[in-house]
Design a protein with these regions (language model features):
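Alpha-helical transmembrane segments of multi-pass membrane proteins predominantly involved
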Residues: 1-204
Length: 204
């Protein structure tokens, strides 16, 4: 039964990670990120107790909430995502398919290296890392770059949970996750402030 839930979580990760590549609305981005952390919880439960695994999803949801609240407080006209987000959905789907093929080929070897972490855990973590790196490669939006970094970190956390069960490490990774969200929120606000100041300087 646990293995079945793990593979369901892998499918959810595949859907959410591809969805993050395709959606343009920041609201859907935050929702998909939150669902992704829920699937991450299921995979981490394969190796960690519920208490420690819950720390991951709570930190992830808090990070998503930080980004969502920051973005909702900024004027929409400051973020022309159509101009900075590639329009080729077919290209992004093709790139995601290549990542999927690489993950399927690398999963058996990586699972063996990582103390037999399990195919579901390994494939889910590699999917997140691969899709996160792909996300970073096709966008310059601060919000999406932050989401890409958080996705890569989530994949690393899943894989690392198979070989390390330290409470201190779990807390440290949760702090890093929150730090990424706070840094992304600060940069969003700072970039918006600089865009507001620039027209005033030109008018002078």
């Amino acid at each position: 039964m646990a293995i079945t839930f793990a593979w369901i979580a892998v499918v959810v990760i595949l859907v959410t990670s591809v969805g993050l590549l395709l959606v343009r609305d920041w609201r859907f981005t935050i929702i998909l990120l939150a669902v992704q952390y829920l699937a991450m919880l299921v995979l981490i439960l394969q190796h960690w107790p519920l208490g420690m695994a819950t720390v991951k999803v709570v930190a992830g949801w808090m990070s998503a909430a930080i980004l969502g609240m920051t973005r909702s407080g900024l004027p929409a006209q400051q973020f022309d995502e159509e101009s900075i987000w590639p329009r080729g959905r077919l290209f992004r789907l093709f790139a995601a398919g290549i990542v999927g093929l690489i993950v399927s080929a690398a999963t058996p070897g990586v699972s063996t290296i990582m103390a037999d972490a399990g195919f579901a855990v390994t494939s889910g973590s590699l999917l997140l890392i691969g899709m996160g790196l792909l996300h970073l490669g096709i966008t310059v939006s601060l919000l999406r770059v932050t989401v890409g970094l958080m996705t890569v970190l989530a994949g690393f956390e899943i894989l690392y949970s198979a070989v390390e069960g330290s409470v201190l490490v779990a807390a440290l990774l949760a702090i890093i996750n929150l730090g990424l969200a706070l840094a992304g929120s600060y940069l969003l606000i700072a970039s918006n402030s600089s865009e507001d100041v620039e027209p005033e300087v030109k008018s002078l």
